[in-house]
Amino acid sequence: MSAKQSSNKIFMVEPREFYSNPQTEGSNHYQMKSANDEKQLILDKALIEFHNFKNNLEKNGVEILCLKGIEGCPDHIFPNWFTTFEDKTMQIFPMNAENRRKEKTPEMINKLCEIYKIQNDFSYLELEDIFLESTSSMVFDRVNRIVYATPSPRTNKQFLNEWCEKNEYDLCSFKTVSHTGSDIYHTDVLMYVGTEIIGISFDVIDEKDRDRVKKKVSLNHKVLEITADQILDFCGNSLEVEGESGNLMLAMSSRAYSALDTEQKDILLKHYKKIIHSDLTTIEKYGGGSARCMLSELF
């Protein structure tokens, strides 16, 4: 069993470009289109938000490994193409959008290989239109070896099953419905797993699967229920991080923090020393992702 759920070390990518990715808007119903003439303005705002968030995490004792993105990768700010493990191995995953596949740069892989050994590189599956977008597709309960996942155009059901079986994770798979009536594109939109508490929106889980998921998440954790409306404010896109002395904190956007009610915040603060939040308005608006999407744990 894994010794810990969260990490003190986080990987982030400072984007070279940032705008609404036309290659992902078909499945990501949380991003807004951007006009070409707005690109520089959007990037400038996103960079301010990025650095403020990074500085906020570092100020609270989180160690950040930050690399710079490349041209042609508007979603480089969301490094969810790999996963690391406590045995110092890493796995690289198949991405749906072509410009997201380019995010796996030799420089980034080489840097990660200074710490981790590549156990599997599943990029070849992209040629077969089989996708499983790492920690966005799969929400890990690392301590209890459970993967939570909702199949979608970016999360192939068969490969998800195969991966969990080979890596000895118990899979809890369920169908979801977004505010548009389609599948929610990434599982980390609707839930996160902490050491003591799981935040999840049962409202967006299909009724046939809901009770089963409720039982599963309640086995080892306190559960914080998030509403469907709060999902639109990215309340589910949060991540537990470790500060100095192993203090556990929850990272999210200021929009998500503002959308939580007083009771929810009080519950979270029983399990966390602090809720770290930063303004990610531009990144959320045009990227369709929030705090968790920007952070990849280094175990």
In which residue ranges do the predicted regions lie?
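The feature marks the mature, well-folded catalytic cores of soluble enzymes
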Residues: 1-299
